[in-house]
A protein has these predicted regions:
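Glycine-rich phosphate-binding loop signature in dinucleotide/nucleotide-binding domains
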Residues: 37, 60-64, 143-146, 166, ...
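Conserved beta-strand hairpin/beta-sheet module of binuclear metal-dependent hydrolase folds
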Residues: 6-60, 163-179
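Metallo-beta-lactamase
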Residues: 48-49, 141, 149-154, 158-232, ...
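Residue-level marker for buried hydrophobic side chains located in beta-strands
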Residues: 42-44, 69, 88, 170-172, ...
Length: 250
């Protein structure tokens, strides 16, 4: 990783897939995925508003940015989308949020159990956001994008999706899981965490989506935040199921 905690980094994580990590501690992930026709790369998720320039630069090194596919439309995932000048797609259940003002009605930040985090998120959410996104088209469960299958993983957001590639058992899963405790963002508390209920549209559905991810038996999970998680498929399945069953960390 770069020594500057704000400097974006780009790394290849799999065939035709690059992780572009930016913003604070390189904690916001945008995945650049090669288009099958060789026309460039598309972005899965769009990070924060401040990442627009670095996303464009990284994509240009890989043939150019063709489109954005939102894993979901929270402000730290849609942030740069209005600035990138390419078509933006999302799940039908996420269009309203993507085109809205960035105020998520189902996230009562006052209920975050760690006091400093309540204030921190209130400050950074408006900074991360780039404003409403004009959605060009929608994508749904079972559709295919550049060799990946769209998987609906609702709960954290109603229209959250992942991209699954069976050939190497790779899942780009947006915020289906966190690999640190999001209620304590100033520290690093490694583990597999379903998003805290305060961040979810439907906490029970979130756990069902974690189990759905587990059932895929991935060998690599590429989340919306932190570095990818790699392992034996059976072991990752066990760990994901345990996280859903125990809601690890809460």
């Amino acid at each position: 990783m770069a020594s500057n905690p704000l400097a974006p980094v780009t790394e290849k994580i799999a065939d035709g897939v690059w992780r572009h990590a930016g913003d604070i501690r390189q904690g916001m992930n945008v995945y650049l995925v090669a288009e099958e026709d060789g026309s460039g790369v598309f972005a899965f998720d769009a990070g924060t508003s401040a990442m627009a320039k670095s996303i464009r630069s990284a994509a240009d090194e890989l043939g150019g940015l063709t489109r954005v596919v939102l894993g979901h439309a929270h402000v730290d995932h849609r942030g740069s989308a209005p600035k990138l000048g390419v078509p933006v797609h999302c799940h039908p259940d996420e269009v309203e949020e993507a085109e809205g003002d960035g105020g998520v009605s189902y996230q009562p930040l006052k209920d975050i159990p760690v006091t400093y985090s309540r204030w921190l998120y209130k400050v950074v959410f408006p900074i991360w956001d780039g404003g409403p996104v004009s959605i060009t088209g929608t994508i749904a469960e079972g559709e295919r994008i550049a060799g990946f299958e769209v998987v609906h993983l609702p709960g954290h957001a109603p229209g959250q999706i992942g991209l699954w590639r069976e050939s190497d058992r790779l899942c780009l899963c947006s915020d289906t899981i966190y690999l640190t405790d999001s209620t304590r963002p100033l520290g690093h508390h490694p583990g597999i965490y379903p998003p805290h209920p305060v961040f979810d549209q439907d906490p029970q559905q979130t756990l069902e989506s974690v189990r759905k991810l587990a059932a895929l038996e991935p060998a690599m999970i590429a989340p919306g935040h932190m570095e990818p998680l790699r392992g034996e498929p059976a072991d990752l399945r066990r760990r994901l199921e345990a996280a859903a069953d125990q809601r690890t960390g809460w």
